[in-house]
């Protein structure tokens, strides 16, 4: 009996040692992954900077899995409760090793694709399509990963498993987003598309986007983007509706004629409601049918200029450092209500967008840095996209570029109605307070808006053209978009409610 007990003690000690070694490997692997996640940007991930840490994580997770998967521990699998813990550790370590190995392999393929020649539009279109294929393959394999048992686990193992589930879900969401973006862009570049494109100015805001001040078209052919020239939306405004509107858009915003003036389409932040109306308006005015609609604002141009470097527009060279000051201040110097000078000023935003497009088309732009800039612009609603094709629209939605608010999203925006360019100087602060009451929760959002307009701005910027909007006076509204599930919405402290009710997938106040 003592001999048997001795053997069991020795076996238990050696088994504990193997599990302890596995725990150390898992910890070192987690540290490497944390470094990758915390310190590296999208561009870093595709420029080999993540590769060393990923290899470290891959090796550590593989060692941990080898320790736990060892035949030495097989007897533990049949021990009640203990076997479940070992099974869970085995599955988690194997999943971690698989994910890092897949990620490392996929990154190597991405780096190989991006290092291949892509100087021409056609070559870049092929790269995008191949990137979509790589992400699709990685995504399908990640979806098949099993994490083992989830119940009756030790607290420390349950916590590790829950963390892994959270991280794996984030990875899957990121892969879905990346694949959808690559598919949508590849479709745009490959299939002779024509999109209506707006340039928006954040100096005069609508809810969740700048006012659409210039409109034009961009067509694609074998990867090449061709801009058809921009037109001032002020000049395109119609005295009568260009197309009928219905539903929430008509009920909330119909009185301001968004179907007659492109500048009022952004009153609703729901781009999937606005874009089809814009496409119908454009067809009514020009006879051109478009396959989709894009918007690009000043912040997006700044992100893109950081990649392309300086561009020339209207005889002026502009870079990422000065584009906001130029478009928010400098371009308005000397501008009056004179139609000729005003039209010249309005054209500058479109000319700048054309310059950026030319720089991207010309080659020599890092695709990794371009992808990072586009990702940043999309996350901030600075680039919005809609497609008339349901499959491509679904890709834009998954990529986060559709401007569609989710069922739990809250958006606080400003709507400028003061005939001025003072939005960059408005400081909006908000506080959220939650008060649970049984199954319900009272939500209070306190918002304050401070006008910090500095002295010395050009007269055209500060307004004063109408009695209702004196110089330096901000006339407009705060728009609060809430989940559809929010009920009993009330307000106090404002000067009145101009719109309340359903607005697409949200409620607006």
PLM regions: where:
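N-terminal Sec-pathway targeting helices
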Residues: 1-5
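Non-catalytic, solvent-exposed segments at the cell envelope interface
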Residues: 7, 11-509
């Amino acid at each position: 009996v003592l001999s048997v007990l001795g053997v069991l003690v020795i076996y238990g000690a050696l088994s504990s040692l193997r599990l302890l070694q596995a725990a150390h490997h898992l910890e070192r692997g987690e540290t490497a992954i944390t470094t990758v996640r915390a310190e590296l940007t999208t561009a870093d991930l595709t420029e080999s900077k993540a590769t060393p840490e990923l290899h470290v994580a891959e090796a550590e997770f593989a060692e941990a899995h080898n320790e736990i998967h060892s035949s030495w521990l097989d007897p533990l699998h049949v021990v009640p409760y203990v076997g479940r813990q070992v099974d869970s550790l085995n599955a988690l370590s194997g999943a971690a090793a698989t994910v890092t190995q897949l990620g490392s392999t996929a990154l190597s393929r991405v780096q190989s694709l991006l290092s291949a020649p892509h100087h021409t539009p056609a070559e870049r279109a092929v790269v995008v399509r191949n990137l979509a294929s790589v992400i699709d393959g990685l995504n399908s394999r990640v979806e098949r990963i099993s994490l083992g048992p989830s119940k009756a686990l030790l607290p420390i193992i349950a916590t590790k498993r829950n963390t892994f589930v959270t991280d794996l879900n984030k990875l899957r969401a990121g892969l879905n987003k990346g694949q959808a973006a690559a598919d949508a862009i590849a479709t745009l570049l490959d299939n002779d598309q024509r999109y209506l494109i707006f340039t928006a100015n954040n100096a005069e805001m609508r809810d969740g986007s700048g006012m659409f001040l210039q409109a034009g078209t961009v067509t694609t052919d074998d990867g090449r983007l061709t801009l058809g020239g921009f037109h001032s939306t002020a000049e395109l405004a119609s005295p009568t509706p260009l197309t009928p509107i219905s539903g929430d858009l008509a009920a909330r915003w119909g009185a301001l004629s968004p179907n007659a003036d492109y500048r009022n389409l952004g009153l609703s932040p729901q781009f999937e409601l606005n874009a089809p109306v814009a496409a119908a308006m454009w067809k009514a005015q020009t006879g051109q049918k478009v396959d989709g609609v894009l918007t690009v604002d000043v912040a997006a141009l700044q992100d893109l200029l950081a990649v392309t470097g300086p561009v020339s527009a209207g005889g002026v060279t502009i870079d990422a450092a000065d584009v906001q000051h130029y478009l928010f201040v400098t371009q308005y110097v000397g501008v009056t209500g004179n139609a000729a000078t005003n039209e010249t000023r309005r054209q500058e935003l479109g000319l700048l967008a054309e310059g950026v497009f030319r720089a991207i088309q010309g080659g020599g732009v890092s695709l990794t840095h371009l992808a990072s800039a586009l990702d940043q612009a999309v996350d901030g609603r600075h680039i919005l996209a809609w497609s008339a094709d349901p499959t491509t629209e679904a890709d834009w939605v998954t990529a986060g570029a559709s401007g569609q608010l989710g069922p739990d999203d809250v958006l606080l925006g400003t709507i400028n109605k003061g005939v001025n360019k003072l939005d960059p100087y408005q400081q909006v602060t908000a506080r959220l307070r939650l008060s649970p009451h049984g199954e319900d929760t009272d939500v209070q959002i306190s918002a304050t808006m401070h006008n910090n307009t500095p002295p010395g701005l050009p007269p055209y910027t500060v307004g004063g053209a109408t009695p209702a909007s004196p110089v330096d006076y901000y006339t407009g509204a705060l728009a609060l978009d809430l989940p559809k599930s929010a009920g009993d919405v009330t307000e106090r402290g404002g000067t009145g409610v101009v719109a309340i009710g359903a607005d697409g997938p949200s409620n607006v106040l």
